[in-house]
């Protein structure tokens, strides 16, 4: 009889424990698919546009240190210009400090037909320059195709590659 009572108590205790157990919540997490090639990334695109505006302003203000700060110089930094072999970050910084440090006046600093393509943490910016720069009395007009590759860093969007090619302008007929 004692065994039946013990068995019955254990059975009742087991039923109570099982019945009192809270239902576990099952939360489904829907995976968000990101299409790096086709998604527009509008917020990042706006950040890149603001970076480009700041780059332009720093050049026009003659703030060379600020202009240089938009570059992420590292062993990975590269630049192509004037059909010459690839430059590294050190050569790029030296060139930009020399050129923009020698400009006596900026008459025009237009970045035309700008296209910003964002691929997550990387952005490709293509544009046509129409820069009219004075070096003393000499006027230099820079019309070129420019490509800037930017990467999102803890300090914002920074240039990791530059490519400059001549822009062939068609004469008005």
Locate each region found by the language model:
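Bacterial Sec-dependent N-terminal signal peptides
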Residues: 1-29
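A mature extracytoplasmic/lumenal domain signature
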Residues: 71-72, 81-83, 127-131, 163
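Short beta-strand edge/turn micro-motifs at domain boundaries
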Residues: 21-28, 143-173
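Hydrophobic pocket/interface hotspot
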Residues: 55, 67-68, 76-77, 92, ...
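Surface-exposed, charged secondary-structure patches
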Residues: 93-136
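Short, low-complexity N-terminal intrinsically disordered segments enriched in polar/charged residues
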Residues: 20-70
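A short gly/proline-enriched turn/hairpin at secondary-structure junctions
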Residues: 76-87, 101-103
């Amino acid at each position: 009889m004692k065994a039946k009572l013990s068995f019955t108590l254990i059975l009742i205790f087991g039923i109570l424990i099982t019945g009192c157990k809270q239902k576990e919540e099952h939360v489904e997490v829907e995976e968000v698919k990101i299409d790096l090639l086709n998604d527009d990334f509008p917020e990042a695109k706006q950040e890149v546009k603001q970076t480009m505006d700041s780059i332009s302003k720093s050049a026009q203000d003659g703030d060379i240190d600020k202009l240089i700060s938009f570059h992420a110089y590292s062993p990975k930094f590269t630049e192509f210009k004037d059909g010459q072999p690839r430059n590294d970050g050190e050569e790029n910084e030296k060139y930009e400090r020399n050129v923009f440090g020698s400009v006596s006046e900026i008459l025009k600093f237009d970045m035309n037909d700008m296209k910003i393509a964002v691929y997550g943490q990387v952005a490709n910016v293509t544009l046509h320059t129409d820069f009219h720069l004075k070096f003393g009395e000499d006027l230099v007009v820079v019309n070129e195709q420019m490509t800037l590759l930017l990467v999102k860093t803890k300090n914002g969007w920074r240039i990791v590659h530059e490519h400059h090619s001549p822009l062939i302008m068609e004469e008005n007929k």
